């Protein structure tokens, strides 16, 4: 659904093998636009100006998503712009929208590492790296509000910790703890909301949910 609720991007598997076609419907008239984007994967994201879609392109043989493209509504798919291309065949790309809807993240991962890049969601262009890839380092990133990203990471934390960092200086040397690393508690996931977070944690095989403020209290 576009941010102004005037258009819907409908994703259909018409060929099998998880190759999807994206079509656009005008919700005020009920008519389908001429836009048709074939052979996509992993859904799509509306830009906040409601003028474009961002989507992933898979390799037709390996099914690995290797490109993130931008489609301008009303234009032909052949004119879509490549925002990011991953040539390392061990990495699979996935684009997702921040909780604030202000940023689009591109996550490239393999079995032993991952890397995240970001761009503005109003007019996505060049993606900027948050922290370069390193073996055995996994991290996820989100944006809730303001000038900071939140980062869940296993850097110096085998059971993961939750950090924050200024968007202007997102590298790991600038990460400061919201939830510090703990030897006996595994930080499984964190769901982010405007005024609080919900942390799912595991201790001695038991899973608990904990509501915390953005400063970790």
What would you call each of these model-derived segments?
Residues 1-217:
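Peripheral, non-catalytic segments that deliver or gate enzyme domains
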């Amino acid at each position: 659904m576009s941010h102004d609720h005037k258009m819907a991007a409908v994703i259909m598997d018409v060929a099998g093998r998880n190759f999807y076609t994206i079509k656009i419907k005008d919700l005020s008239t009920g008519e389908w636009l001429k836009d048709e984007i074939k052979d996509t994967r992993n859904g799509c994201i509306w830009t906040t100006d409601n003028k474009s879609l961002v989507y992933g392109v898979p390799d037709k043989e390996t099914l690995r998503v290797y490109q993130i493209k931008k489609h301008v509504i009303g234009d032909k798919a052949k004119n879509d712009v490549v925002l990011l291309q991953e040539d390392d065949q061990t990495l699979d790309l996935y684009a997702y929208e921040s909780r604030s809807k202000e940023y689009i993240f591109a996550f490239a991962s393999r079995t032993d590492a991952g890397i995240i890049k970001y761009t503005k969601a109003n007019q996505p262009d060049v993606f900027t790296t948050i922290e370069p890839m390193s073996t055995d380092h996994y991290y996820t990133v989100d944006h809730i509000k303001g000038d900071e990203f939140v980062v869940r990471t296993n850097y110096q934390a085998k059971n993961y910790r939750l950090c924050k960092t200024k968007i202007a200086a997102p590298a790991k040397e600038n990460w400061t703890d919201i939830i510090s690393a703990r030897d006996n508690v595994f930080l499984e996931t964190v769901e982010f909301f405007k005024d609080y977070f919900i942390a799912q944690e595991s201790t001695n095989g038991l899973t608990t949910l904990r509501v915390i403020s953005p400063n970790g209290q």
